[in-house]
Regions:
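N-terminal beta-alpha supersecondary unit
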Residues: 1-52
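Surface "functional belts" at beta-alpha junctions
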Residues: 10-11, 15-21, 75-176
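Short, charged, surface-exposed secondary-structure boundary motifs
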Residues: 23-24, 176-183
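Stable alpha-helical structural segments in soluble proteins, enriched in small hydrophobic residues
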Residues: 33-37, 71, 89, 181-184
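Short glycine-aspartate micro-motif
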Residues: 43-49, 57, 100-104
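DPxDG-like acidic metal-binding loop motif
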Residues: 47-81
Length: 184
């Protein structure tokens, strides 16, 4: 579960691994981040991950974002979880200039959600659309093999076609972080 507030150059946020417990943590995390301030005084726009990812986690995130936005007459902006994950890895210093990135999230059904892209100039540039596939069914969006596989879907790397990932570094513990997305 990850939340962030970016206001007037100040960033505060929380990022906690709470598998299957987002609904019990998200509002408490929001309250802690607001620190007693009214939502309307602290926020101009609400953004949330819109997938792909855990169906329940996405429902919680989108429901809370929509409910808060509706109650305060604020706009909502959605962002791709796979892009957020890649930006997080890059801003944590885990990606190198020119890395060919496969951002992957375990779909929990012997498949993964994936998105190809490149790390250039301090940003993740996507190459194609997000997809879901079995590890053995992975197709390259270009002729360039991955130099790094990030996210929980990296656990399938041994089953992915070797011509696409054989020399790729693996970072399975990277997850999207709202603090990074708030700064973008």
């Amino acid at each position: 579960c990850t939340l962030a507030l970016y206001a007037e150059g100040d960033l505060c946020g929380r990022h906690e691994i709470v598998a299957r417990a987002h609904n019990r943590h998200i509002l408490g995390m929001l309250s802690a981040i607001l620190g007693g301030r009214a939502l309307a005084d602290a926020v101009d726009i609400i953004a949330c991950g819109i997938g792909p990812g855990s169906f329940t986690g996405l429902r919680v995130a989108v429901s809370v974002a929509q409910g808060l936005a509706w109650s305060q007459d604020m706009p909502v902006h959605g962002f791709c979880s796979l892009e957020a994950q890649a930006h997080t890895a890059g801003h944590q210093g885990l990606l190198r200039e020119g890395d060919r990135v496969l951002s992957a999230i375990d779909a929990q059904i012997d498949q993964f959600y994936g998105l190809w892209g490149d790390w250039r100039g301090g940003a993740f540039a996507t190459d194609g659309e997000a997809f879901v596939c079995a590890p053995e069914g992975l197709l390259a969006e270009s002729s360039c093999p991955a130099t790094i596989v990030i996210g929980s879907g990296a656990r399938y790397q041994e089953r992915m076609p070797s011509d696409l990932i054989s020399t790729a570094r693996s970072l399975p513990d990277v997850t999207p972080d709202a603090r990074v997305m708030a700064e973008l």
